[in-house]
Amino acid sequence: MSKVVIVAKIKIKEEFKDEILDELKELHKSTHDLDDGCIQYELHKDLEDTNSFTFIETWESAELLEAHMATAHFASFAKTIENKLDALEISKLEKLI
């Protein structure tokens, strides 16, 4: 079973920055506290764009990543961010070396 790496780039609309940043922090905490298979779940801020953030995640398997995406806390986050982002780009990766 291969580990899965996720890079999720989020650009928040200016007027929602504080609200969504709080939600990102809560999602980080809930994921670490509740989700099996989470090896890494780090939130980074962009040094050149104050409205942009990146999650770098590592999961033990694709199945455990899918389980995370089916949790109540992830569903709540997804609903909260609706229409509050300028951009969302998600890359699903597998480490080669």
Q: Predicted segment positions?
A:
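An amphipathic, aromatic/His-enriched active-site/gating alpha helix that lines ligand/cofactor pockets
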Residues: 26, 30-38, 58-91
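N-terminal first-folded block
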Residues: 4-33
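Short flexible/disordered coil segments
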Residues: 14, 69-70, 96-97
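A broad, low-specificity signal for short, low-complexity segments enriched in glycine/proline
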Residues: 1-5, 14-19, 49-54, 90-92
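Short, well-ordered beta-strand segments in beta-rich or mixed alpha/beta enzyme
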Residues: 4-10, 42-69
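Non-catalytic surface loops within mature trypsin-like serine protease
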Residues: 12-14, 61, 94
